[in-house]
A protein has these predicted regions:
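Charged, low-complexity intrinsically disordered terminal segments
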Residues: 2-435
């Protein structure tokens, strides 16, 4: 038998290709850390108790704090003018971190405000994600840098670092003078303008925070900035004394816990915070998420609470979603949730991109994290847990306003979906670790 002789360079590239394929498949299909099969606890305190907040702080490795205010802002019509106003009022520092930044009207207005701030001698820094920020207007970015602005990119694509590339910086943290900040689901792209009036304008929420809540956002920004840019940000201009700012508020003072997560560690607190907060529910639990692919432990606690007679409702996107495969993966779990009594709705007018939980009208979670494995294990994320009835009431009212424009999924009809749809769901769920 004749033996085929291959050039050494061909053998090298074959071996390199096989190793690259094995590495990619390992990264895609193996979880970052081993999850427990279930969480157990005889009783979790109610969300309005001090014991609950201390338990939350324990699993999040973050302290319970008091002070600061939170104001809910729905859709670009509300939050974008507030962001621009805060930029225009900044006196010392602006730190701007978002996942997506794409050229357009919204980008132009933000750059205009940031460049004017630089001319006022305000220090301005931007963190861009190496994947989500690639649509930015390069010309405007150069003008910004020439005016004195600083920019860093989180994990841009590099050959040999592809297993790190798929772990993204998904955090949202916009902070002015260390005292006023914004957190939520929105980013810099024209689809976040307007009032969700059509499919070209998304439904989303941001939260304006002040005081110690804003300082927590500052920490989420500075952690990424220091690790990526190599500059330590210290001093009163980043962490001002709160006393001199008291009284400049929109709402009542709140107790809160701020959580930031990173893929560099096997400690992933967001999943634990989600579970504990849902477990603590006594009457009603309302979730709104753009991407919903929970692991088994989170699905089980949602089903458990629904079987207890708690009003558990989940609001998700319909086919206006910007990624059909994640929606199909989500659909795989609808039947088991509906059978347990969970009520599921799909928002009809446009893509809904909000990321919120409100429990018993007393406790809320807002931030960048989705209800999926990518957010709990892979991405850098930041969320804010707020124990304040006024804010929770605003969030709950918004939830029911959104339900007026949503279609409820019914178990009987859902069971009749086609064989093709079921196969599609199973195929999509193979990649649920990555959505």
């Amino acid at each position: 038998m004749e033996i085929i002789s291959l050039p050494i360079w061909v053998i090298f590239f074959l071996i390199f290709g096989i190793l690259a394929l094995v590495t990619a498949l390992t990264a895609l299909f193996f979880p970052i850390f081993s999850r427990p099969k279930k969480y157990t606890n005889s009783e979790v305190p109610a969300v309005d108790s001090e014991d609950f907040l201390q338990a939350l702080a324990g699993v999040a490795n973050a302290p319970v704090q008091s002070g600061g205010q939170a104001k809910l802002l729905n859709n670009g019509e509300q939050f974008f003018p507030e962001i621009l106003e805060a930029i225009n009022k900044a006196e010392k520092t602006i730190n701007f971190m978002t996942y997506i930044w794409t050229k357009g009207k919204m980008s132009d207005l933000v750059f205009e405000g940031l460049i004017k701030a630089l001319h006022r001698k305000v220090e301005v820094r931007i963190v861009l994600d190496g994947f989500g920020g690639t649509g930015i207007d390069d010309e405007k970015l150069e003008i910004f840098k020439k005016a004195g602005g600083k920019v860093c990119w989180f994990r841009p694509a590099h050959l040999g670092k592809l297993t790190r590339f798929y772990r993204r910086n998904h955090r949202r943290a916009i902070i002015m003078d260390g005292f006023v900040g914004f957190i939520g689901g929105a980013a810099i792209e024209d689809k976040w303008l307007g009032n969700a009036e059509n499919p070209e304008h998304w439904r989303d929420s941001m939260v304006k925070v002040t005081g110690s809540m804003a300082e927590n956002l500052q920490s989420a920004f500075i952690q990424v900035w220091t690790d990526t840019y190599g500059e330590f940000l210290v001093g009163r201009k980043f962490y001002p004394h709160q006393g001199k700012h008291e009284g400049t508020t929109d709402s009542t003072t709140s107790k809160h816990v701020s959580i930031i997560s990173s893929p560099s560690s096997e400690f992933h607190p967001i999943s634990n915070v989600f579970w504990l907060s849902i477990k603590a529910g006594r009457e009603k639990i309302y979730l709104t998420y753009s991407y919903f692919v929970p692991d088994k432990t989170l699905r089980n606690i949602l089903k458990e609470k629904a079987r207890e007679g708690i009003d558990v409702r989940i609001l998700l996107p319909n086919d206006y979603i910007d990624g059909n495969t994640i929606r199909w993966a989500s659909h795989r779990y609808f039947e088991e949730l509906l059978q347990a009594g969970v009520k599921i709705y799909e928002y009809q007018p446009t893509m809904i991109h909000s990321k919120t939980i409100v429990v018993d009208g007393k406790f809320s979670i807002v931030g960048s994290a989705n209800f999926d494995i990518r957010s709990t294990e892979l991405n850098k994320e930041n969320i804010l847990c707020i124990a304040e009835k006024g804010f929770a009431s605003d969030l709950e009212n918004t939830f029911f306003q959104d339900l007026k424009h949503a279609k409820q999924m019914k178990l009987g009809a859902w069971k009749k979906r086609s064989f093709f749809r079921r196969i599609r769901e199973r195929f999509a769920s193979l990649f649920e670790e990555q959505y």
